[in-house]
Regions:
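ATP-binding N-terminal substructure of ATP-dependent carboxylate-amine bond-forming enzymes
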Residues: 1-79
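Short coil/turn connectors at secondary-structure junctions
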Residues: 6-8, 46-47, 69-70, 99-101, ...
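Short acidic-hydrophobic, aromatic-tinged amphipathic segments that line or gate anion-handling sites
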Residues: 26-33, 105-109, 140
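A general structural signal for well-ordered alpha-helical segments in protein cores
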Residues: 35-38, 59-63, 87-91, 113, ...
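Catalytic-core regions of core metabolic enzymes
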Residues: 67-68, 79-80, 112-113, 145, ...
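A conserved helix-loop-beta module that forms one wall/lid of the active-site cleft
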Residues: 74-136
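Conserved ATP-binding module of the ATP-grasp superfamily
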Residues: 100-102, 119, 123-125, 141-167
């Protein structure tokens, strides 16, 4: 941690007002989706450990990339990050390995998902399959609410590409 005497600098990208107040911490305007820029920064500043927090770089494989370049990294591999990156992948994984999970179905289009609503009990949960910054879950008390959720996800693109499939 930054409190350890052996730590001289902690770089945070992008950081925030709170991290800026911490001793030894420097906020960066570094594009964390550009793996080569992150790699170059780490090598230039002799960074000893990268802790990856945001979901998107993990799902995109930043941990694997940096490790392949000899940079110590704390974060799941790209394959493991798929558990967070795709609700369908997670559900399939749980079923394959006998991990208890709620019943589900996934759909790539509005009409198929709409037809499914007649076969389920309420309340139910409608989720955007992909990364939606923690906002892709809608709890629906009845069919009308579920239809509105599907409309928002598929037709209004409320969650962008994360909503190309729903669970």
């Amino acid at each position: 941690s930054a409190q350890d005497e052996s730590v001289t600098n902690v770089f945070v990208a992008p950081g925030n007002a709170g991290t800026a107040l911490e001793p030894k911490v420097t906020n960066l305007s570094l594009d964390t989706n550009n793996f080569v820029k992150v790699e170059n920064f780490c090598k230039e500043k002799h960074v000893e450990l990268v802790i990856i927090g945001p979901e998107q770089p993990l799902v995109d494989g930043m941990s694997d990339y940096l490790q392949s370049k000899g940079i110590n990294t704390f974060g799941p591999s790209q394959a493991a990050a798929q558990l967070e990156g795709s609700k369908t992948f997670s559900k399939d994984f749980f079923i394959k390995y006998g991990i208890p999970t709620a019943a589900y179905a996934s759909f790539n289009d509005f009409d198929s998902s709409k037809n499914y609503l007649d076969t389920i009990e309420y309340p139910t949960v409608v989720k955007a399959d992909g990364l939606a910054a923690g906002k892709g879950v809608i709890i629906c008390g009845n069919k009308d609410e579920a239809l509105a959720a599907l409309d928002s996800i598929f037709k209004d693109q409320a969650f962008g590409e994360a909503g190309n499939r729903v669970v």
